[in-house]
Amino acid sequence: MEVTMEDRSVKADKADRDDNNTTSTELLGKMRQTKVISTNQNNNHLIDRMVSIYEMEMIKSQSTETISDVSDVLEFTVIDNCSHGTHTLEHDLRLKGEPIGKSESVKGVSRSLIIQIGMTVIFCALEFITGVVCSSIAMLADSYHMAADVMALIVAFTCIKIATRPSTRLGYGWVRAETLGGFFNGIFMCTVCVLVFQEAVGRIINVHMITHPLQVLVIGFIGLLINLFGMFNLSGHGHSHGGGSHGHSHGGSHGHSHNNKKTKKNDGHGHSHANGHGHSHDGKSDCNGEEEPDHTRLNGKFRSASAMANSDANVRLLDNDDNSNDIIERRLSGVNSQNTIIATVDRQMTPYGTHMASEVLNVSSNNLDKSAQKTEQKKDKNVNIHGVWLHLLSDAFGSVIVMISAGFVYFLPTWKIAAYLDPILSISLASIMGFTAVVLVKTSGEKLLKQTPEGLDLEKVKKDLCSIVGVSKVEKLSVWTLCGQRIIAAAHVNICHPAVFPEAAYKIKNYFHDLGVHSTTIEPTFEDTCMQSMRIMVKKVVDGKSIEEPVSVSTENEITE
C-alpha cells in the first residue's frame, strides 16, 4: 500500500536542519493538531474527536551558537464520510468497563494440600492392611480410592506450585496446569471406579464374610473424620471470591500483513502469539449483514498493564522506507486526555495512511466510576481443587459404606444378606464416583479445548461490537476459558481508519469487561472504502496566526494496491 501525499512542512524542516547542522544547535518544536469529524453522526451525540500530534526533535552540532526556538503548527481536519459514525447504537450498549474483582490465596491452598497429603498417605496404608486382614472388599476399595487420592493431591499440589511460575515458552505461563491437573484427577477417579466395580462383582460371585468387623468399623470412622476435615479445609479454596481488583494481561497476539511487496528485515514477521492462540479468518460478520472482500490485514496488539494504573496507549506505525531519516515520532493525545499514543510514521504518509501495524497497549481506567464497580461476588471454580474436593467427597461416602457394611456384620452376624451388603454398597460407591468423575473430565476437557463459555451468544456479541463507532465488521471472534472464570476474548475487527481505532479499542475492552472477560485481544483491519471517503483539511499556523489558506485534500486516489 502506498500513500503519495507529501508532508511539505516536514521536508522544509529537513532542509533547515541540513543548513544549520554545522553552525548551531537548534530546537524545533512542531505541533500538529488533527480534528476528526464524522458527517454521519447523530446531532444529539456529536463528538469532535481530537487527536493532537506532537513532534519534538533535538539536533546537536559542533557549534555553541544557538538560535531562538521555532514553533510551527499544522492543523489537519479529517472529515469522515463513512457510514459507521453514529453514536445511537453505541449508546444502547451502556458501556461501563468495570474492573473484574478476583482474589485467591495460593499459599493457603498449598498448606492445606500438604496436610491432607500426609494424613491420606498414612490412612491409605492403614486401610489397605486392615482390608486384607479383615477380608473387607469395601475397605480395600476405599484404600484403592485413597491411593488415587494421594496421586490426585500430589498432582494438585504440583499444579498449584508451577501455575505461578513465569514461562518464556508458554503464552500464559503454567496457569492452565490447574485445569490439566483436574483432567487427570477425573481420569484417576474413572480408573478407581473400574477397579472397585471389578472387585465388587467378584465378591458377589465368591461371597466372603468380613472378619473383625469392629476394627473395620473403627477404621472407617477415622477415615470419615479425615475426609470431612479435608473437605472442610479445601472448601474455602474451591472458589475464589471477588474482592480486590487486579491487572489484566491484554497481551494480544497479532495477525499478519497480506502484502506481496518485499519488506524490510526488521518489518518481516510471522505470528507472535503471546497469548498462545491463533486466529483464522473465516466466519466473517458484516455489520450490514453483507459479505465483503478481504482487505489488507493490518495487525494490532491490545494489552493492559494494570486495570487501575494510569498508563498510556501506545501505537507504533511501521513503514517500508529504508531511509531512517524519513521516520519521525509523533505523540498523539486521544479522545480521553489520559489516553495517549506513540506513533512512528513515514514522512510521505498522510496522518492516517493504511500501511501500518498498530500496537495498542493500555488505556487508563481511572475515569471509571468506582461507586459503580461490581458488588456482586462471582464464584470462580478452581477445577483442580474442585477435583480434589470430589475425591474427598467420594472417600467420605466410601467410609460411610465401610461403616454400614461392618456395622451390619458386627451387630447382625447371623443375617445372610449382610455378606452381600458389602459388595453391593461398593458398587453403589463406584457408581457415585463414576458420575462425579465423568462430570470433572467433561468440565476440564471443555476448558482444555477452549470451548465458548456456556450462555454466551457469539452472534449477539458480534452485533454489539458492530454498534461501536468506527467498527464496520467483525471478521473473527473467539471467546474461551483459560482457567476457572478467567475468560479470554480475541476479536478481529474492521475499523474505519486509524484515527478512531484507539477510542474503538477502548470501548471494545470495556464491553468485554462488562461481560466478565478477563483479557481481550484486538486485531484491527482498516477499511479501504472508509479511508477513501475521508477528506483532510490542512492549515499551517505560526505563532497562532494562519499563514496558509486551508487546503482540502481527498484521500480517494491516494491509496493504491
From Swiss-Prot:
<feature type="topological domain" description="Extracellular">
    <location>
        <begin position="198"/>
        <end position="215"/>
    </location>
</feature>
<dbReference type="GO" id="GO:0071294">
    <property type="term" value="P:cellular response to zinc ion"/>
</dbReference>
<keyword id="KW-1003">Cell membrane</keyword>
<feature type="topological domain" description="Cytoplasmic">
    <location>
        <begin position="1"/>
        <end position="112"/>
    </location>
</feature>
<feature type="region of interest" description="6 X 2 AA approximate repeats of H-G">
    <location>
        <begin position="246"/>
        <end position="270"/>
    </location>
</feature>
<dbReference type="GO" id="GO:0010312">
    <property type="term" value="P:detoxification of zinc ion"/>
</dbReference>
<feature type="transmembrane region" description="Helical">
    <location>
        <begin position="421"/>
        <end position="441"/>
    </location>
</feature>
<feature type="topological domain" description="Cytoplasmic">
    <location>
        <begin position="158"/>
        <end position="176"/>
    </location>
</feature>
<feature type="region of interest" description="Disordered">
    <location>
        <begin position="240"/>
        <end position="304"/>
    </location>
</feature>
<feature type="transmembrane region" description="Helical">
    <location>
        <begin position="113"/>
        <end position="133"/>
    </location>
</feature>
<keyword id="KW-0217">Developmental protein</keyword>
<dbReference type="GO" id="GO:0046579">
    <property type="term" value="P:positive regulation of Ras protein signal transduction"/>
</dbReference>
<feature type="compositionally biased region" description="Basic residues">
    <location>
        <begin position="247"/>
        <end position="264"/>
    </location>
</feature>
<keyword id="KW-0472">Membrane</keyword>
<dbReference type="GO" id="GO:0006882">
    <property type="term" value="P:intracellular zinc ion homeostasis"/>
</dbReference>
<keyword id="KW-1133">Transmembrane helix</keyword>
<dbReference type="InterPro" id="IPR027469">
    <property type="entry name" value="Cation_efflux_TMD_sf"/>
</dbReference>
<comment type="function">
    <text>Involved in the regulation of Pn.p cell fate determination. Involved in zinc metabolism and the decrease of the cytosolic zinc concentration which is thought to modulate Ras signaling. Involved in zinc transport from the intestinal lumen to the pseudocoelum.</text>
</comment>
<dbReference type="GO" id="GO:0016323">
    <property type="term" value="C:basolateral plasma membrane"/>
</dbReference>
<dbReference type="InterPro" id="IPR002524">
    <property type="entry name" value="Cation_efflux"/>
</dbReference>
<feature type="transmembrane region" description="Helical">
    <location>
        <begin position="216"/>
        <end position="236"/>
    </location>
</feature>
<feature type="transmembrane region" description="Helical">
    <location>
        <begin position="137"/>
        <end position="157"/>
    </location>
</feature>
<comment type="similarity">
    <text>Belongs to the cation diffusion facilitator (CDF) transporter (TC 2.A.4) family. SLC30A subfamily.</text>
</comment>
<dbReference type="GO" id="GO:0016020">
    <property type="term" value="C:membrane"/>
</dbReference>
<keyword id="KW-0813">Transport</keyword>
<keyword id="KW-0864">Zinc transport</keyword>
<dbReference type="Pfam" id="PF01545">
    <property type="entry name" value="Cation_efflux"/>
</dbReference>
<feature type="region of interest" description="Disordered">
    <location>
        <begin position="1"/>
        <end position="26"/>
    </location>
</feature>
<dbReference type="GO" id="GO:0019901">
    <property type="term" value="F:protein kinase binding"/>
</dbReference>
<dbReference type="GO" id="GO:0005385">
    <property type="term" value="F:zinc ion transmembrane transporter activity"/>
</dbReference>
<protein>
    <recommendedName>
        <fullName>Cation diffusion facilitator family protein 1</fullName>
    </recommendedName>
</protein>
<dbReference type="GO" id="GO:0040026">
    <property type="term" value="P:positive regulation of vulval development"/>
</dbReference>
<feature type="topological domain" description="Extracellular">
    <location>
        <begin position="413"/>
        <end position="420"/>
    </location>
</feature>
<feature type="compositionally biased region" description="Basic and acidic residues">
    <location>
        <begin position="1"/>
        <end position="20"/>
    </location>
</feature>
<keyword id="KW-0406">Ion transport</keyword>
<keyword id="KW-0677">Repeat</keyword>
<keyword id="KW-0862">Zinc</keyword>
<comment type="subunit">
    <text>Interacts with lin-45 in a zinc-dependent manner.</text>
</comment>
<feature type="transmembrane region" description="Helical">
    <location>
        <begin position="177"/>
        <end position="197"/>
    </location>
</feature>
<feature type="transmembrane region" description="Helical">
    <location>
        <begin position="392"/>
        <end position="412"/>
    </location>
</feature>
<feature type="topological domain" description="Extracellular">
    <location>
        <begin position="134"/>
        <end position="136"/>
    </location>
</feature>
<feature type="topological domain" description="Cytoplasmic">
    <location>
        <begin position="442"/>
        <end position="561"/>
    </location>
</feature>
